[in-house]
Amino acid sequence: MRAKARAYTMQALVKYHGLKDWRLRIPYHDSISVNTDVAYVVAEVSFGDSEEDVVMANGTPLTGRAKERVVAVLDRVRELAGIKERAVVRTESHPRVGAKGLGFSSAAGASIALAAYVAAGLDKVYGRDVTLVSRIARLLAGSACRSVVGKYARWYAGTGDHDSYAVRFADERNLPLRFAIVPLGMEATTEEAHREAESSPYFRRRIEVANERCDRVERAIKEGDFRTFGVEVERDSLELHAITMTGSSGMILMSPDTLRVIELVRQMRRSGIEAYFSMQTGPTVYVNTLPEHIDEVAQRLKEAGYEVMVSGVGGGAELVSS
């Protein structure tokens, strides 16, 4: 009872913020992301004779809340499969980057969910049910449900476990996105940011705006309208951080380098390069552009002294040979 799977990290385009159900990880509103093709997590899951679940991430045992989130996935798989065996889970992140906002938790959730699903024999019962795997992955990290399906994905918030999952709605043939990732580190966790969001006086309005923006961004992607896409994703990133900063603790998750990269992107636009910035809950910046501009964008960021990862649109979670 063993399987191995790979899942790519994702760039959240319309970000979710806050959870109305923390156990099931049900968000307040829909969200949209695109998978990368440059960073991923490989997970191996085996069910057997262990006395307890063992979870290793990049060779280090997980404990506490990090382990609990993995066990939530394993428990759901065991429930569906009607088994009681404990599991050994091993994950490896590629590349190893000490930055926040690269989506490795989403890739881990997606790869663990698929590997556990197959290791427990659920594929023989339900077939390769991507929607079910998406729902299972959500229990580890909300965004993992989008990493499962890959390409351009929309997570429908739903009302409970049965209808909160992601659907792929477009791929690079619709919008041939390329993006330069500037990885930047921080200490805070995504969960802290989600809890902080709900105390912002602007949070309720954010829910309304985010659902409306999902419709606009989805339409722009399907129609290949890069300018509308870029403008909406930039605005969403700024709103996301504004919500966090106006919460009860006043969390500031951007760094001075985040602001420098934002200004570099604006300078690029003034010089005629189509480029737009995007951030998730951390300081890492994604610079979205088109194939004809990606080399120039990456070069300018490197000349400014930043490490750069260049990515295109990545696929969904997939099995790999052991």
Residue ranges of model-derived segments:
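C-terminal nucleotide
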Residues: 2-22, 26, 48, 171-322
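Short alpha-helix boundary/capping segments
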Residues: 62-65, 103-104, 202-205
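ATP-binding N-lobe of GHMP and related small-molecule kinases
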Residues: 1-100, 117-122, 291, 311-322
